């Protein structure tokens, strides 16, 4: 199988991310589990551009976000056909959707750091 340049793979991932985000935001995906509050964080496209893993998160909570990911997984065929037309690809990568906890983890870590800093400031003034 032919390897594709890393730059092209990255650009394709960014285009896929933007198109899927727009489909979600505009309500083009009719599955009721897919909320406009879902966020497509990034897309990992395989070197041969055969598969793409789409990382999704939301501030709505773990259960609702996982439901949204399942809705996207159910609509993967529709999304893939839209992508193939918009991106003018001979073969659009197979899509898989993954619940991404990295944003939630980062937010939690940031809050912990803020609490430590504010606690440190209070003890300095005491």
From Swiss-Prot:
Pfam families recorded: RBFA
Transmembrane segments: none
Signal peptide location: none
PROSITE patterns attached to this UniProt entry: RBFA
Gene Ontology, cellular component aspect: cytosol
Swiss-Prot/TrEMBL keywords: Cytoplasm, Ribosome biogenesis
Subcellular location: Cytoplasm
Main location: cytoplasm
Single GO molecular function: ribosomal small subunit binding
Gene Ontology annotations of biological process type: maturation of SSU-rRNA
Function: One of several proteins that assist in the late maturation steps of the functional core of the 30S ribosomal subunit. Associates with free 30S ribosomal subunits (but not with 30S subunits that are part of 70S ribosomes or polysomes). Required for efficient processing of 16S rRNA. May interact with the 5'-terminal helix region of 16S rRNA.
Stored PANTHER family: RIBOSOME-BINDING FACTOR A, CHLOROPLASTIC-RELATED (PTHR33515:SF1)
Subunit details: Monomer. Binds 30S ribosomal subunits, but not 50S ribosomal subunits or 70S ribosomes.
Family per similarity comment: Belongs to the RbfA family.
Protein known as: Ribosome-binding factor A
Gene from which the chain derives: rbfA
